[in-house]
Regions:
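Short conserved AdoMet
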Residues: 10, 93, 107
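C-terminal lobe and adjacent flexible extensions of AdoMet/dcAdoMet transferase-like proteins
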Residues: 6, 154, 174-265
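Short catalytic micro-motifs in class I SAM-dependent methyltransferases
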Residues: 86-90
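A short glycine-rich, Lys/Arg-flanked "PGG" loop and its adjoining helix->strand segment in the class I
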Residues: 96-111
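Conserved catalytic/acceptor-binding region of the Class I
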Residues: 113-175, 183-196
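Class I SAM-dependent methyltransferase SAM/SAH-binding core
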Residues: 2-77, 82, 97
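Catalytic cores of nucleotide-enabled group-transfer and carboxylate-activating enzymes in metabolic
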Residues: 73-76, 102, 135, 220
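Domain-wide signal for the mature, well-folded portions of proteins, strongly enriched
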Residues: 13, 36, 123, 142, ...
Length: 265
């Protein structure tokens, strides 16, 4: 996603990194290198993640003259030229609200760059759960075309969507589960209503590695998961002038307009 910024004509003077603790610091570091003169505002709505972000960003003690970068719960309205969000949108419980927050944070002609998981993600794990009659392991992910529609509804213009499929392989079932925990939560309303037992977890790992498991890779002894990664960007346009729902014309003016004869050239 960072490489796509080369097509943006104007470099931002202020950009927002939305939830960098979830999106990863590698991309944030690349952006800081690309825009060394720009100010960066990190947004972490949750207090716990604010603390983690501050700990990660704090300069070493010997660099006492450097100020700790700012981490806030909400971005100021209408100031940023770019908003960056990596792998967050699919895990948000109210994505429509989040898109409106992004729109509010951007200045006119500013743009949002985001990535998220698409509907083909975790298809092997979904098949495994279905085979065993278990509730889905994850909520359903939104299609990229629907994200484009939601961007327009939130006030954005010229949305551009793209996607790619990535297959990751793992040495064993615990490695798969550890990666899934880092990716987020299962927001499906049909998920297990209570925590599963240790015995159930062991059964899950055995099913993942069984000879008929959909997760088995062509590489001997490894497990695979497919991820559909959606990329999107859109601009915040100049606000349109509001048009009244009705217009009142005095009767005398209406009669005068109707009584005028058309002129000929």
């Amino acid at each position: 996603m960072e490489s796509r910024l080369q097509w943006m004509r104007q470099a931002p003077t202020l950009w927002v990194d939305w939830s960098p603790t979830l999106g990863g610091w590698e991309a944030a570091d690349l952006l800081s290198q690309r825009y060394p003169q720009a100010r960066v505002l990190r947004v972490e709505p949750a207090q716990a993640r604010q603390t983690r972000a501050l700990a990660r960003l704090a300069p070493p003690r010997w660099q006492f003259w450097k100020a700790t970068p700012q981490v806030v719960a909400q971005a100021p309205a209408g100031q940023a030229q770019m908003l960056w969000s990596n792998m967050l949108l699919h895990a948000h419980p109210n994505p429509e609200s989040l898109l409106r927050q992004w729109h509010a944070a951007l200045a006119v002609d500013g743009y949002v760059m985001f990535s998220c998981l698409g509907p083909d993600s975790l298809q092997e794990l979904r098949h495994l759960y279905a085979q065993n009659g278990w509730p889905p392991p994850s909520h359903s992910f939104t299609d990229m075309h629907d994200w484009g529609d939601l961007l327009v509804q939130a006030g954005f213009a010229e949305p551009v969507m793209d996607m790619e499929r990535i297959t990751l392989t793992y040495p064993d079932a615990p490695a798969v589960l550890a990666d899934l925990r880092d990716l987020g939560r299962n927001l499906s309303p049909s998920r297990h209503p209570v925590c599963r037992s240790r015995a159930w977890g062991q059964g899950l790992q055995q099913a993942m590695a069984s000879p008929d498991s959909p997760l088995l890779s062509t590489q001997a002894g490894r497990l695979k998961l497919t991820f559909e990664v959606i990329y999107g960007h859109a601009f915040k346009p100049t606000p349109r002038a509001r048009v009244a729902s009705k217009t009142e014309v005095p009767l005398q003016d209406l009669k005068a307009m109707l009584g005028r004869r058309p002129t000929r050239d």
